[in-house]
Amino acid sequence: MNTATGFIVLLVLATVLGGIEAGESHMRKDAMGRVRRQYCVPVDQPCSLNTQPCCDDATCTQELNENDNTVYYCRA
């Protein structure tokens, strides 16, 4: 195999591997996006007003705990 043929083979191989890697990272990005969009805080769990929403039509409500500290919980 001469130098030109070897160079072409390496170029094709790099292109194929690059395409496979790009395709996998694109799929990974889509999957992570779906996971992030579907995440919500379960009912009766602590929440934050500026983070993920509560599940099952619950709302993040302010309450006082036993030490009179303000806490937030998802309540239905």
From Swiss-Prot:
The record comments on the domains as follows: The presence of a 'disulfide through disulfide knot' structurally defines this protein as a knottin.
Propeptide residues per the UniProt entry: 23-35
**GO MF annotation terms:** ion channel regulator activity; toxin activity
UniProt lists the family membership as follows: Belongs to the neurotoxin 08 (Shiva) family. 02 (omega/kappa toxin) subfamily.
The protein depicted here goes by the name Omega/kappa-hexatoxin-Ar1g
Where the protein is mainly located, per its record?
secreted
Which residue windows are coiled coil? none
* Record keywords, A-Z: Cleavage on pair of basic residues, Disulfide bond, Ion channel impairing toxin, Knottin, Secreted, Signal, Toxin
Specify the signal sequence span: 1-22
Entry function:
Toxin that may inhibit ion channels.
Gene Ontology cellular component terms for the protein in this record: extracellular region
Q: Highest taxon of the source?
A: Eukaryota
The SS bond pairs are: C40-C55, C47-C60, C54-C74
Q: Is-annotated flag, keyword Secreted?
A: yes
Supply the source organism for this entry: Atrax robustus (Sydney funnel-web spider)
The cellular location(s) given in this protein's UniProt record come to: Secreted
Q: In which tissues is it expressed?
A: Expressed by the venom gland.
Q: Does the keyword Disulfide bond apply?
A: yes
Additional observations: Several paralogs that code for the same precursor are shown in this entry, whereas an additional paralog is shown in AC S0F1N2.
